[in-house]
Amino acid sequence: RLVNEFRDYARLPAAELKSIDLNALVAEVLQMYASENARVPVRMELDPNCPRVLGDAQQLRQVMHNLLQNAQDSTESAGPGVEGSGVLIKTHCTDSARRVRLTVLDGGTGFPEHILKRAFEPYVTTKAKGTGLGLAVVKKIADEHGSRVDIANRVADGKVVGAQVSLSFAIENVVPV
């Protein structure tokens, strides 16, 4: 499994950026996570005012799958929690930033500080059976899209209540840098 995932990571093709509706892509991907028997429920909050973005739909599907699977794993391993503390994927657009933000939040235990600093490096993982390539692939695809990617622990009442990963994409009439 590790060899196959590394091969896929190493041979990731260049992104073919086209105009895409990120909200529609999120809704499409989420259909695979909508089962009543889902390990951890996944909710979505889509900003209806989001313009189209420049992206490679296939690669962005991969990003969403990696982030959603990680979020489900983390939330599940944290055990039963607060009602509604499942996984959330959302989009948000700010007019001033001229970018669309995609964020995945989980209800897990967050990342230890030493992992948080290196989370996007290959082979860094918190999972016993993880390969450590999921977030490395996310970072590589984000770079191909000229996207900023951020990862942070979510804190409430002084304790970590999960993690979040956010990517921001240029809207379609803005040339990527």
Where do the PLM segments sit?
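Conserved micro-motifs of the catalytic ATP-binding
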Residues: L12-A15, R52-G55, T126
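A conserved beta-strand-to-alpha-helix junction within the catalytic ATP-binding
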Residues: E16-L30
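Conserved catalytic submotifs in the C-terminal HATPase_c
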Residues: P41-P51
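Short beta-strand-loop-beta element adjacent to the nucleotide/active-site pocket used for signaling
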Residues: G84-L88, H92-L102
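Short conserved segment of the HATPase_c
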Residues: F111-P122
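Short alpha-helical Gxxx[C/S/T] motif in the catalytic ATP-binding
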Residues: G134, V138
